[in-house]
Every structure is written in structure tokens, then in C-alpha cells.
């Protein structure tokens, strides 16, 4: 069983045998949950108390450190803070879009979502991140865990799910 501590707040979730639970052991329906695309400033169709995947496009977040979209990331943080008020919880799904990173761009893709994680680190409604299939999973998890050890990681990949601490979605 994997239990994690949030840096600035109490842990809300734990992962066990590819399932997500609240800290009191109540199952959370992560597998098959709805996924929506982040759109800061827009009202998203989520119900109070819902758990969902929130897709964040690489182009929206910024493709490299010279082009991180701080306006988008600030809007994303504001949207996540609104989710907190409605007890909506999400995990971030990094999306490469039609521009899957070539191996030379993989580091930039990971760095972009590491930067995204820094910008939303105080959002209690974020349970963690999905591990993108287009990058080295161990590297992605290691990079995000270095400063954000409280995140739980999610995947649909059977190979990654061999680690019972990764949650199936």
C-alpha cells in the first residue's frame, strides 16, 4: 500500500492495488471517470463532489521554458481553486496532442508538466498526474515526485499498472 503526505495540506487519497481510496478507505471511482479538457475561465461541466481527469495540452501549458504560458497556468490554478470550493477532485492528464514529443523533445515535455505542477502545487483538489505514454514513465514520475511527493500517479498502461501504487483510470 502506498500512502503519501501532501506538503502543505493533509493527504486526501491513497493508492492501493491500482485503486484510489480516500484516506479513510472509501473507494474513489477513478477507473472510467470522466475526462474533460482544461479551459481556464470557462465553466466546466463537473458535478460537486466529482472525481475526474483534467486534460492539459502541452501547447497550452507551454512547450519549453522560454514559452511557458503563465497566463494559462494562472487561469488553471484559479479554476482548480474553484473546484476545491465545490469539492471536485481531479488528476492532471498531460496531452501532447498531435505534436507527440520526439525523443529530443521528451525532456521539454516533462519539464513543461513539472513547471505546471509547480504552478498548481497549492491546489488541494489535484490528486496527481497521469503518466503519459509518450515519455519514459520512470523519468516522468521521478521528475514530478522530486518536489511533489504527494502526487499519486495514474495510467491505463498494463505495464505501468504492474506497480500497484499506480492507479488505473
Stretches with model-predicted labels:
Residues 78-83, 87, 106, 115, ...:
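A broadly structural signal marking compact, well-ordered functional cores
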Residues 114-169:
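Active-site region of glycoside hydrolase catalytic domains
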Amino acid at each position: 500500500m502506498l500512502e503519501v503526505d501532501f506538503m502543505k495540506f493533509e493527504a486526501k487519497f491513497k493508492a492501493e492495488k491500482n485503486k484510489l481510496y480516500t484516506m479513510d478507505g472509501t473507494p474513489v471511482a477513478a477507473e472510467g471517470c470522466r475526462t474533460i479538457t482544461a479551459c481556464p475561465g470557462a465553466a466546466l461541466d463537473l458535478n460537486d463532489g466529482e472525481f475526474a481527469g483534467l486534460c492539459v495540452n502541452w501547447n497550452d501549458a507551454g512547450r519549453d521554458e522560454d514559452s511557458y504560458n503563465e497566463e494559462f497556468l494562472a487561469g488553471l490554478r484559479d479554476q482548480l481553486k474553484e473546484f476545491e470550493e465545490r469539492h471536485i477532485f481531479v488528476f492532471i492528464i498531460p496531452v501532447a496532442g498531435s505534436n507527440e514529443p520526439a525523443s529530443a523533445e521528451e525532456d521539454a515535455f516533462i519539464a513543461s508538466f513539472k513547471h505546471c505542477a509547480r504552478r498548481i502545487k497549492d491546489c488541494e483538489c489535484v490528486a496527481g498526474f497521469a503518466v503519459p505514454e509518450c515519455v519514459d514513465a520512470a523519468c516522468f514520475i521521478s521528475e514530478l515526485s522530486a518536489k511533489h511527493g504527494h502526487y499519486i500517479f495514474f495510467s491505463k498502461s498494463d505495464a505501468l499498472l504492474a506497480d500497484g501504487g499506480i492507479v488505473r483510470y
